[in-house]
Amino acid sequence: MEEEFRTIMLNTSAISEVVGNRISFNSATQGAALPYIVLHVIDDQEEHTYQGPDGLSQGRVQVDCYGATYGQAKTLSRHVRGALDGYRGGQFSAIFHASTRDNREGGTNEPERPFTVQLDFLTKWRT
C-alpha cells in the first residue's frame, strides 16, 4: 500500500514538479531541500468476515506537506488533496480526505522552522 500511495503523488505532475522525488515515509532525508512531503501510516486494519480475512484493508495515512513559507506548504497540500481525495485505482478501492491541520515545526531557530500542512486520508485497499 505504501509504495502505491507514494507513486500516486510522484505521478501527479502538480506535485512532482514542486517536490521532485522528495516524498518519503516517517521522516525526510536529512538536509532535504524544501518543499517536501513526509507520509505516516496512522493505522492499518485488515477487514474480516466470519470465515477470516476478506482481502480488504482500511487505514489512515497522514501526509505532511513542508514548505519554507505557509503559502508554499498550503499550495502543496492543495495539490496533494486534489490528487488523492476520491482516488480509485490500482489496489485502492477508495482514498478520501478526512482532515487538515496547519502547523509550524518547533525548534530554537524560528526563521529556519518550516511550515507544515498535515492532511489525513482514509484508505481502503485490496491486500
Give, region by region, the residue ranges found by the protein language model:
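Low-complexity, flexible helical/coil segments
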Residues: 58, 71-79, 98-101
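Acidic-leaning, charged glycine-interspersed low-complexity segments
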Residues: 82-127
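Solvent-exposed residues in well-ordered beta-strands and their adjoining turns
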Residues: 42, 66-68, 122-126
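A broad, low-specificity signal marking well-ordered, structured residues that form hydrophobic/aromatic
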Residues: 37, 61, 119
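A generic structural micro-feature
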Residues: 31-33, 53-57, 111-116
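Small/polar-rich, solvent-exposed N-terminal microdomains that initiate assembly or binding
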Residues: 1-53, 71, 75, 82, ...
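Active-site-adjacent structural patch at catalytic or cofactor/ligand-binding sites
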Residues: 58-66
